[in-house]
């Protein structure tokens, strides 16, 4: 007897085997796929409620991507030794899975739906994120849930002028492009990328190369669905025709007038008044409602979108009165906070970001622990979106998925422009506080971050700016919108964010909600985005054009020196005793790397100098003939022991204390005296021989050869 009815599809994809299997694991889920690529394995499951919860007027879709430590043969750290709250990476991959599948559910589908993807094995070569996107799409396609997929996904790298599909984790480290693209058989739905100043044509080529590369994956999912898919659920959507006619009659003219108001708050008030009028007429407080409330609300929202779209396509005029290419007025300011290492205020229309850069040392690096292992991150960018930025009162707390996603988008835009650790050995943290928002706060963060970093003296390769674009498509007509408002973001068919320098693109993010947007439209859109980006860079240059020559007054200074690797142990000392003493006595922070690189940091230059001299005294040997400052540590009958060069002790014989005959050591020096000594050499037991007589104790001048030789006693 066979317990399982297993169906599988296997294809060769970008040089590795992709296996999609269903029927053995998680059989009570609506859809479940056990997927393997190389030796990376994920389980994707889909469950969608059979009915809609009362009062739900949106599509409650949640995507949870989770990495299990056992997948890489590891035990989680921390006290509890088990997986805890989602990491930043898990949150970002959850968003990556969510974005291309969300637009493919029918409008009006309100059943709570949950996609859970669990990484079960990781071969440390094939990133599980692409496999998770493919497996989620396959699970949805098999589930019977109304889903207009399947979706494919691929990662594209750009190496030596060639596109490489699904590079390994090692290959991604050295590429000029790391781009993820997802879509259906005939449309691109999502792009997420980081690039090293690539042209619009190279970026678009990567998108199209990725799209064509995952077509065999979509075909495999369709073949699997033909064998194993569940019966499609009946989806009965209400007929909106009557409601649309009624709402249009009441609201069209008033909505058109409301959307001519350029101020966001006033416009919202006018739209709310129109909505209240519609609800008052169609859903009277007394008597019977003419239509269901949620249906009226949905149709009213649709009409809002149509009014804005009609106005743009018919007249070329947008909500705030701009034409399609105009960027809102920009004001860039730097150095606005007195004690910050670097700060900027970037205002574009009704969107504003206060961005602050802080410099730290190696010990401030973030330790990141994921399936690939543990690594240290020296560039941190945190994006905060407080509710007051949109004139609302709301929850404050730890960052949500959106804030993490927007922060990472800005991080990708700035990261390729950072100096190397050798050029600039600082840990860098940028915090963006969105103080006003009406569209494209993530791109305001990119601009503000670039300004704040330059204000802090970080030598960026070039200033970076970002712009959010929108697109409206009706049949053959389309309009590309530069610098979109918040309202235009969710009323359009495509929104995409492009960040980069005057030389090229560093980050591209696209979300496309409909089919029919082809390569040519994307090319026009990217060209218009470049115009906007260059305009914004010009406005930013009015505030600052490059990194300041000096670091901020309150930023730590870091100086670097190299010591022999065999001396590292001596500088650190038993249990860290020596390095701890240096830090405590000098006030400097010290970081020693395995190759002997030592970074000494402090906001006080004298503190750095003292620490470096101390380290040098331990790590380098004193040279014969050199003159050193020293301290008398012990007085004996035959001379004085002097501590010099930090931690070295040597003997000044009584005959080398001063000119002429010295009867008693204590006649010349006593313990604690500061003296100048010349290193004469070493005796046959390796002990250090010093002279005070050959050094002018006032000036430190070398007196050797300027006086007759004098024999040491006992010679």
Curated annotation (Swiss-Prot):
Catalysed reaction, written as an equation: RNA(n+1) + phosphate = RNA(n) + a ribonucleoside 5'-diphosphate
Occurrences of domain S1 motif (ranges): 625-693
Disulfide bond residue pairs: none
Gene: pnp
Enzyme class: transferase
Keyword Metal-binding: yes
Xref: NCBIfam families: polynuc_phos, PRK11824.1
Family of the protein in this entry: Belongs to the polyribonucleotide nucleotidyltransferase family.
Major site of localization recorded for this protein: cytoplasm
Cofactor(s) required for function per UniProt: Mg(2+)
Gene3D superfamilies (UniProt xref): GHMP Kinase, N-terminal domain, K Homology domain, type 1, Nucleic acid-binding proteins
Species lineage: Bacteria, Pseudomonadati, Pseudomonadota, Alphaproteobacteria, Hyphomicrobiales
Name this protein carries in UniProt: Polyribonucleotide nucleotidyltransferase
């Amino acid at each position: 007897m066979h317990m399982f009815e297993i169906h599988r599809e296997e294809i060769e994809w970008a040089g590795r085997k992709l296996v999609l299997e269903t029927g053995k694991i998680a059989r009570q889920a609506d859809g479940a796929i056990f997927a393997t690529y190389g030796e990376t394995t994920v389980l994707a499951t889909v469950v969608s409620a059979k009915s809609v919860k009362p009062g739900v007027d949106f599509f409650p879709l949640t995507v949870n991507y989770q990495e299990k430590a056992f997948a890489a043969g590891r035990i989680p750290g921390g006290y509890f030794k088990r997986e805890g709250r989602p990491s930043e990476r898990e949150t970002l991959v959850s968003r990556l899975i969510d974005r291309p599948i969300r637009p493919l559910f029918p409008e009006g589908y309100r059943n709570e739906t949950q996609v859970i993807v669990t990484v079960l094995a990781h071969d440390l070569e094939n990133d599980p994120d692409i496999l998770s996107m493919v497996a989620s799409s396959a699970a949805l396609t098999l589930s019977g849930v109304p889903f207009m997929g399947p979706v494919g996904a691929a990662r594209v790298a750009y190496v030596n002028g060639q596109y490489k599909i699904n590079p390994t984790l090692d290959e991604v480290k050295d590429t000029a492009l790391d781009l993820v693209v997802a879509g259906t058989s005939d449309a691109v739905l999502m792009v997420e990328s980081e690039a090293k100043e690539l042209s619009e044509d190279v970026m678009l080529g990567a998108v199209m190369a990725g799209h064509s590369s995952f077509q065999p994956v979509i075909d495999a999912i369709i073949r699997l669905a033909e064998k194993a898919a569940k019966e499609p659920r009946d989806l009965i959507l209400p007929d909106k025709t009557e409601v649309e006619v009624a709402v249009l009659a009441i609201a069209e003219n008033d909505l058109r007038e409301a959307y001519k108001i350029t101020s966001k708050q006033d416009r919202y008030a006018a739209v709310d008044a129109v909505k209240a009028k519609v609800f008052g007429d169609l859903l009277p407080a007394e008597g019977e409602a003419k239509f269901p409330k949620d249906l009226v609300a949905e149709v009213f929202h649709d009409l809002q979108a149509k009014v804005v779209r009609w106005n743009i396509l018919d007249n070329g005029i947008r909500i705030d009165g701009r034409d399609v290419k105009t960027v809102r007025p920009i004001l860039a300011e730097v150095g606005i906070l007195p004690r910050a290492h670097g700060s900027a205020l970037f205002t574009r229309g009704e969107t504003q970001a206060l961005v602050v850069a802080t410099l730290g040392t190696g010990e401030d690096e973030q330790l990141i622990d994921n399936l690939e292992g543990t690594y240290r991150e020296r560039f941190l960018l945190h994006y905060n979106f407080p509710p007051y930025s949109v004139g609302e009162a709301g929850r404050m707390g730890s960052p949500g998925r959106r804030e993490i996603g927007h922060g990472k988008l800005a991080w990708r835009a700035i990261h390729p422009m950072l100096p190397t650790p050798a050029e600039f050995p600082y840990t860098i943290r940028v915090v963006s506080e969105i103080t006003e928002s009406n569209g494209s706060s993530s791109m305001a963060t990119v601009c503000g971050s670039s300004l704040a970093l330059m204000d802090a003296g970080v030598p960026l390769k070039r200033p970076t700016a970002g712009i959010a674009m929108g697109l409206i498509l009706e049949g053959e007509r389309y309009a590309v919108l530069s610098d979109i408002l918040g309202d235009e973001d969710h009323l359009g068919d495509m929104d995409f964010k492009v960040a980069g320098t005057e030389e090229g693109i560093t980050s591209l993010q696209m979300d496309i909600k409909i089919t029919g947007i082809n390569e040519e439209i994307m090319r026009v859109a990217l060209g218009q985005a470049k115009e906007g980006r260059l305009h914004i860079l010009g406005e930013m240059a009015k505030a600052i054009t490059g990194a300041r020559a000096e670091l901020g007054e309150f930023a730590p200074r870091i100086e670097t020196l190299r010591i022999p690797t065999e001396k590292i142990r001596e500088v650190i000392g038993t249990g860290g005793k020596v390095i701890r003493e240096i830090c405590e006595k000098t006030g400097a922070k010290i970081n020693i790397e395995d190759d002997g690189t030592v970074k000494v940091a402090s906001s006080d230059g004298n503190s750095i100098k003292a620490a470096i001299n101390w380290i040098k005294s331990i790590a380098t040997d004193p040279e014969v003939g050199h003159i050193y400052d020293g301290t008398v540590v012990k007085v004996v009958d035959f001379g004085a022991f002097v501590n010099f060069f930090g931690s070295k002790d040597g003997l000044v014989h009584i005959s080398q204390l001063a000119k002429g005959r010295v009867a008693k050591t204590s006649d010349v020096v006593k313990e604690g005296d500061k003296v100048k000594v010349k290193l004469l050499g070493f005796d046959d037991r390796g002990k250090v021989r010093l002279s005070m007589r050959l050094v002018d104790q006032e000036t430190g001048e070398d007196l050797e050869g300027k006086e007759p030789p004098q024999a040491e006693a006992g010679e």
